[in-house]
Swiss-Prot record:
Residues that hold GTP according to the record: 40-47, 174-180, 199-203, 268-271, 325
All copies of domain G-alpha, residue ranges: 32-353
Highest taxon above the source species: Eukaryota
Protein family: Belongs to the G-alpha family. G(q) subfamily.
Name of the gene: SCGQA
Chain positions covered by the region annotation G1 motif: 35-48
Chain segments carrying region G2 motif: 172-180
Recorded GO CC terms: cytoplasm; heterotrimeric G-protein complex
Stretch list, region G4 motif: 264-271
One of the GO biological process terms: adenylate cyclase-modulating G protein-coupled receptor signaling pathway
Listed name of the protein: Guanine nucleotide-binding protein G(q) subunit alpha
UniProt xrefs under SUPFAM superfamilies: P-loop containing nucleoside triphosphate hydrolases (SSF52540), Transducin (alpha subunit), insertion domain (SSF47895)
Region (G5 motif): 323-328
Lipid-conjugated positions (S-palmitoyl cysteine): C3, C4
């Protein structure tokens, strides 16, 4: 009987050891997943960043995937033209060519949210409107209304996009605007570690959905659009977009949930800042700026300092990078540096040594 018990005890001990071994392995495996939370106000470039991760570290976009973007590109073209035609009325600009009044009426009749084709009549009307001096003046005054950053890119490419065998390029896909509603997760494997990138909607109405994303966050990746210093919110036309971004950043970095998460600040759209700073002066919107006019470098350093100064904890380092989310090589380079930072900060915890 004693012998029998001894055998049973041995077997039980073996089973317990196996269970403990499996539990340790499960814990170790769970720790090899890094959760990166992408935050920022609407249109700061979060979704574009996720697309870049898919191109650089994932499977990219197949021909079938690209075809799925055709109608969204068409919708972006019509949406941009609608925005400018509406703004022509609001800011009281006339068309230079009288016929474009008719073209504008025709384009306004197209529902840009459901359009799936780009017919030759619409193409002619869009090309004529885009060439009109009135529309060009309206485009130059785009900070006075809401217009997507990619408007010029698509409108300059209407002839190519209107081709019958059109297939969106990676750049077309990166620039397409689809507001993020809900939460998008994109996991990718890098050196046997899973990076789980979580993109949440940036518009105010989307932010209440973030709360359950806050657990076990390795790093906060906060995006700021450098070019938004002179723009107002989609939701409120008397509030500056960059002030909203600053307020959100201050809230995020002081949240109790994130006290153990590293913070990486992406100052995005540096290309648009370089373009805009030549005619729209930072000092007109941020009087404390004492740098030179038309100095993109000085402007972006000032904006970086504004955000870093919001950090109340002297022991917490804010890691910052200037980015252009539509430039794959720039993002490849920046994310390699970010990955190294994250891994260095988590060597022990994630069993990487």
């Amino acid at each position: 009987m004693a012998c029998c018990l001894s055998e049973e005890a041995k077997e039980q001990k073996r089973i317990n050891c196996e269970i403990e071994k499996e539990l340790r392995k499960a814990k170790r495996d769970a720790r090899r997943e890094l959760k990166l939370l992408l935050l920022g106000t609407g249109e700061s470039g979060k979704s574009t960043f996720i697309k870049q991760m898919r191109i650089i570290h994932g499977t990219g976009y197949s021909e079938e995937d690209k075809r799925g973007f055709i109608k969204i590109v068409y919708q972006n073209i019509f949406m941009a033209m609608h925005s400018m035609i509406r703004a022509m009325d609001t800011i009281k600009i006339s068309f230079e060519v009288a016929d474009n009044e008719e073209n504008a009426i025709m384009i306004r009749q197209v529902d840009y949210e459901t359009v799936t084709t780009l017919d030759s009549q619409s193409v002619e009307a869009i090309l004529s409107l885009w060439a009109d001096a009135g529309i060009q003046e309206c485009y130059d005054r785009r900070r006075e209304y809401q217009l997507t950053d990619s408007a010029k890119y698509y409108l300059d490419a209407v002839d190519r996009i209107a081709e019958p065998n059109y297939l969106p390029t990676l750049q077309d896909i990166l620039r397409v605007r689809v507001p993020t509603t809900g939460i998008i997760e994109y996991p990718f494997d890098l050196d046997s570690i899973i990076f789980r990138m979580v993109d949440v909607g940036g518009q105010r109405s989307e932010r209440r959905k973030w709360i359950h994303c806050f657990e076990n966050v390795t790093s906060i990746m906060f995006l700021v659009a450098l070019s938004e210093y002179d723009q107002v919110l989609v939701e409120s036309d008397n509030e500056n977009r960059m002030e909203e971004s600053k307020a959100l950043f201050r809230t995020i970095i002081t949240y109790p949930w994130f006290q153990n998460s590293s913070v990486i600040l992406f100052l995005n759209k540096k290309d648009l800042l370089e373009e805009k700073i030549m005619h729209s002066h930072l000092v007109d919107y941020f009087p404390e700026f004492d740098g030179q006019k038309k100095d993109a470098q000085g402007a972006r350093e000032f904006i970086l300092r504004m955000f870093v100064d919001l950090n109340p904890d002297p022991d917490k380092i804010i890691y910052s990078h200037f980015t252009c989310a539509t430039d794959t090589e720039n993002i490849r380079f920046v994310f390699a540096a970010v990955k190294d930072t994250i891994l260095q900060l988590n060597l022990k915890e994630y069993n990487l040594v």
